[in-house]
Amino acid sequence: MIFYLYPVIVYIIMKIAIAGTGYVGLSLATLLAQNNEVVALDIIPEKVEMVNKFISPIQDEYIEKYLAEKELDLTATLDGESAYSNADFVVIAAPTNYDSQKNYFDTSAVEAVIELVLKVNPDAIMVIKSTIPVGYTESVRKKYNTPNIIFSPEFLRESKALYDNLYPSRIIVSTDPSDNRILDASHTFASLLKQGAVKEDRKSV
């Protein structure tokens, strides 16, 4: 973490790991890499190679434009341990496929990330961005005996994901008011999303 002190404003560069480079993950990686050090993780070598060449592996006009034209502190990797080991925040945007017949979300990919983060960097704040069932965040906090998991729902459209992050209708981040560290982390993450947005006056809750 690096602090730049000016007369009035303190700029903080955070180290952020993003697990997953689908619409949610890559749009967030692009948004946050404008002002922070971001490492994106994926299991597909071709996607990692493309991101490292600043070529979008998904169709999204704004992601393509920002990767090509903006100065972004963004790298991609296949190595989860290296991605998570020094991160202040780990954003989990892993797939959670929904089975409508069984009314079931497959959260195994999310929990695989949680387990690896707890192994290599247990103090990191994990922010779940994946689609998950009601009550899931609280259940994994109890299951893994850690307070360092929060949830921030996404309101994104495919092919418009970065645009919707740049012009958010609202920013929502869960917290634990009984834990000052988590309360501060939630406010910090909401501020990072606002900082990357074109319009920073959006209400966050």
Annotated model-derived regions:
Residues 1-13:
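Short, Lys/Arg-enriched N-terminal segments with co-localized hydrophobic residues
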Residues 10-204:
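Structural/interface elements that position substrates and couple domains in central-metabolism enzymes
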